Amino acid sequence: DGGACVADSGVSRIKWPAIAAINDGNTKSLTYHVLIPGTFGPENTYVNTAGVRQYESDTNTGGRYIYTPQNNIDPSNPRTPNIARVDDDSNVKTPDVGLVKARTTSISETGNSATSQATIGELIDYTVTATLPNGTTFGTNAKITDTPNSATTQPLTGPATATLNGSPLPVGWSISTVGQTITVNIPDGYVVPPGSDHTVVISFQTRVADVSANVRGQSRTNQANISWTDSTARSRNSNQVSTTIVEPLISQAKSNNKSTNAQPNDIVTYTLVTSNSSASNVSIAHDTVIKDVVPVGVTLVDGGGNPLADGAIVPGTGGATWDAATRTITSAASPAININPGGNVTWTYQARVDSPAIAGSVFTNTANAKTTSINGSDANERTASSSTNTGYSANSSSTVRIGGSSVTKSVDPAWVTIGTPMTYKATVTIPQGLEFFNLTARDILPDSIDFDGYTGWSCISGCSGSNPAPTVQNYNPQVTSSVTNIGWDMGHLDPGAADRVIEFTYKAHVRDTHRSGGAPVLAGENIVNSVRSMSNTSNKFTFNPNSIPAQSG
C-alpha cells in the first residue's frame, strides 16, 4: 500500500501516503510484516501502535475540513487536535519462563499423606523445574534460587543437585548452597536455541526438625524464584508448596467396676483405654508403650481368679506382662502398638481385693502411655521425651474404695406427742474381713428432741469367741442450741470371720419448744435425726468421752 519505513524523532515508523477516500461505513486495511530481533529475552512485550495522523471531509459550503486526532501518532504534526484520538495497540510477547516446584514426603500412611503432610523427623524431597523457552536469550545475572523455610524448622540434609536437560550442569553453570539458600547461576547471555526448550531441574531434601516451632497444624511453605536482567530486571516466582505438619495426639482413660464399697476378695475389673484423636492433622501414634502400676492392696488374677506369677502375660491386655517387683503391667514390645487416628487400644483385666483389708482404704492405680512420631527407631523422631511433646504422652488413674461399716436406725413409737418417751435403735453392721481403726457411731438429734440417756448395746449377730464383739464406750452428750450429739466408740477391730451386727439403744422425748429460737413444736412436724458410722485407716486418736469425732462425708 505504499508504506515506507522512516526514522522520525528517533522512532522507527511506517508512513503511508494519503488514502484518497474511505466511503462511509467502509474500512481500509494496511498490511505489513515485521521481524522480531534475532536476540531477545523471555517475557518481553513489543508494543506496536498504529494511528491516523489526520483526515479530511467535504463541508456543506464547498470546502474541506481537516480533522486532527489528539495524542497524535505523528508528534511533528503542527495542527491543533480537534477530535478524539484515533489509534490502537497490538502487542507481541515472547514466551514466559516456566518455574514449577513440587515435593514428596518420605512417609505415606493413614493421617500422613505423602503429597501434602509430614510428621516430625520426616524427610521432604523437593524438585524445582525451570523451563527456559527456546529461541530466547538470557541477559545478565540470571539465576534460580530457593530458600526452603528455615534452617531451624526445615534444615537441608545435604547439598542440592541440578541438571540441565537431564545431564550435569555444563561449564559456565554453577550450583551453590549457602546456609539454607540454593542458587543455580546461568551464564550471562545464555542462548536457548530455537526448537526445544531447555529444562533445569534442582533437587534437594529437608527434614522436619524436632523443634518447638514445628507443631501439629503448622505449615512449612516454600517457593522458588528465577531472575535475570535484559532491558530491565525481571523475576518470576514458582508456585508455593505448603506441607502441613501432622502428629499423634494420644489420651488415656481408666475405670473400674468397684469404685465404691469394695469388699475383701471382690474381683475388680479394670478397663484402660489409650486413644489417638480423630481431629485434623493427627497421624499414627507409633511404637506406643503403655504401663499400668497396680497398687498394693489388690492382686492381679487370671480368668480363673488365680494370682498371676511374676512375668506372666496379663489376660485382656494383648500380651502385656506383669512385673511383680515394680507392680507394673507393661505392653509387649512386639508387635509394636501403632494407633491410627480415631483408634484406640483397650485393656480389660482383673484383680482381687486382698483379704483382710482396712476399712475405708483407697487403692489408686496410675497408668501412662508414651508414643513417637515415626515407626521404628529414628533418631530424628519426636517422642514423649522431646522438649516439645504435646500429644506424645497421656496419663490416667482409677480408684478402688474399700467399704466400711453401715448403720440403720429405727424408733419406737414412730408417732408421738410432746413428752412421749421414745426408744431409738442404731444398728451397725461390721463386714467380715475388714480391719477398723477408731470405729465410731455418731447420732445427731435435732433441737426438737431431748436426749434422755443411753440404755445399752449388744451384739445381735456374728459375734463369738473367735470373732469378738467390739469394746464399746459411750460419749457424753454434747448439747448445743441447735443439735444434740451422742455417740459410741468401738475402737480398733481386727478383721472378723463373719459380719458382726451391733445394736445401740437410747431414750429420748419430744420437746414442747425448739431449743433454738423457742418456737413451739407443732403437730405434724416430721422430726428427723441421723446416725452415721465412720472409721480411720489408722489410729488417729485416743478415746475421749467429751470429744466426739467430727462426722465426715
Indicate where each model-derived feature is located:
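Exported/extracytosolic protein signature
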Residues: 1-553
